[in-house]
Amino acid sequence: MKIVAFAGSSSKESINKKLVTYVAEQFPNVEKEILDLNDYEMPIFSVDREKHEGIPTLALEFAEKIDSADLLLIALAEHNSTYTAAFKNIFDWISRIKDRKHFGGKNVFLLATAPGPAGGRHVV
């Protein structure tokens, strides 16, 4: 079994990255890969950009990582009562890959935490 985990945040000090890393560590004797969205920074999605430039290589590489997993652990950061622009952008790009489900039809364990009073509940 392989777990691929990531936080939907581009913050270097992301509490959601800490959370998803901690949760991944609770699965002993399982192959784990923790992704950092900063390693997959790409242009803001637009249909026009896709038409002229195609899907960015980094989006394809991120999708391959997702496809390699048996289980996805995702901890979503909350910005202004919604998920982050970084997560939305990568989600938009991978959703455009032909004949592919957004998260490859994988099982997803969704987490969130936030320091505010909502505690991340708007994104789960």
Q: Model features per residue range: what roles?
A:
Residues 104-124:
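Short, glycine-/small-residue-rich phosphate/pyrophosphate-handling segment
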Residues 1-99:
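N-terminal beta1-alpha1-beta2 submodule of the flavodoxin-like/Rossmannoid cofactor-binding fold
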